[in-house]
């Protein structure tokens, strides 16, 4: 576990924020440090964006924000911790909505309800994954990769950030649509998977942009495509996987959530302040440096999108054949 402490605060996720607090309490919020749980190892996209948001809140509100890394069990450990915390605005969750949605489809029994136990605070980003390969792999396009995988069934290994995570789902969806078989090697987070790709331990990783972009520029990793349905403005030269495999579309969403029953007034303050940060022209460049695009949304709009994503990703997880190790 690693914690980063900033002079400010952040929030987590819930379909209904039923409880309310006196107006003066909401206006004085926060009056003590806030803990922002990140269910991923340090060094990844979620960790980076959480620290940017935490730093902003601390500066604006004059309270510490502790960014608390709690990886494990495909984000379930961190999610459970937040779900069972009081809905008072002092325990928040920086979550990968796609992983949240995937878990809802993969696990028959979770220690929390992905909808009922969280309330939306603010969207943070949307970004493609990058279909990345080791330079030694003789494939320079998605079509060539599909042909190579068909010629070597079960012999080409891909790395992921863990079974049931978005990197795993992206690869398994690719396998199903392409009609190929590849070996899955799960790691404890995205950074170790990229390290394995650099070392040649695996041949393929569907990676976050920030984790592979420097290595793509240096030639140590070859990028073949983006996982979104359209080209990304961040990587305009890369075609979508869907150009070769119609229907392929995997988007990495990030969001701030809070425990259920967090008062609407507090959710509103958090949403307004985080959206104010993301509305700055300078923030667009910061997000782009992390390979992400800013997404601004109100809590009610977020809740609708969140439920749609859970339904979509649950279906993808089932159809792709992702299996828990």
Task: For each feature predicted by the language model, list its residue ranges.
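A ligand-binding cleft/hinge motif common to bilobed small-molecule-binding domains
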Residues: 98-109, 168, 173-177, 204-237, ...
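Short beta-strand->loop
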Residues: 113-123, 181-185, 203-204, 213-250, ...
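N-terminal (or domain-start) structured segment
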Residues: 17-116, 155, 176-204, 208, ...
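Residue-level signal for nonpolar/aromatic packing positions in well-ordered secondary structure
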Residues: 34-36, 43, 50, 67, ...
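Hinge/capping helix and adjacent helix->loop/strand transition within the periplasmic-binding protein
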Residues: 84-90, 97, 105-192, 241, ...
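An extracytoplasmic/periplasmic, membrane-proximal ligand-sensing/linker region
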Residues: 31-33, 176-177, 217, 264-325
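Bacterial N-terminal signal peptides
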Residues: 4-15
């Amino acid at each position: 576990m690693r914690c980063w402490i900033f002079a400010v605060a952040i929030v987590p996720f819930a379909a209904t924020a039923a409880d309310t607090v006196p107006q003066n309490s909401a206006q004085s919020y926060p009056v003590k440090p806030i803990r922002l749980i990140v269910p991923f190892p340090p060094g990844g996209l979620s960790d980076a964006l959480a620290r940017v948001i935490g730093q902003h809140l601390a500066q604006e509100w004059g309270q510490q924000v502790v960014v608390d890394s709690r990886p494990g069990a495909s984000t379930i450990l961190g999610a459970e911790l937040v779900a069972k915390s009081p809905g008072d605005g002092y325990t928040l969750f920086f979550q990968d909505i796609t992983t949240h949605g995937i878990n809802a489809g993969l696990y028959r029994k979770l220690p929390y309800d992905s909808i009922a136990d969280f309330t939306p605070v603010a969207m943070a980003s949307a970004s493609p994954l990058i279909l990345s390969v080791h330079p030694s792999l003789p494939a320079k396009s998605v079509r060539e990769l599909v042909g190579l995988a068909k010629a070597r069934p079960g012999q080409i290994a891909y790395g992921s950030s863990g079974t049931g995570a978005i990197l795993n789902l992206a690869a398994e969806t690719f396998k199903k649509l392409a009609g190929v078989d590849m070996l899955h090697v799960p790691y404890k987070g995205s950074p170790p998977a990229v390290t394995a790709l650099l070392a040649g331990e695996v041949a393929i990783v569907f990676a976050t942009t920030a984790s592979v972009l420097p290595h793509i520029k240096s030639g140590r990793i070859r990028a073949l495509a983006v996982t979104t349905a359209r080209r990304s403005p961040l990587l305009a030269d890369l075609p979508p996987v869907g150009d070769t495999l119609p229907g392929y579309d995997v988007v990495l969403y990030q969001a701030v959530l809070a425990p259920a029953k967090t008062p609407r007034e507090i959710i509103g303050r958090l949403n307004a302040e985080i959206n104010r940060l993301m509305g700055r022209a300078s923030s667009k460049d910061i997000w782009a440096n992390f390979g992400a695009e800013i997404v601004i949304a109100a809590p009610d709009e977020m809740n609708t999108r969140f439920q749609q994503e859970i339904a979509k990703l649950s279906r993808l997880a089932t159809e792709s054949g992702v299996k828990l190790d």
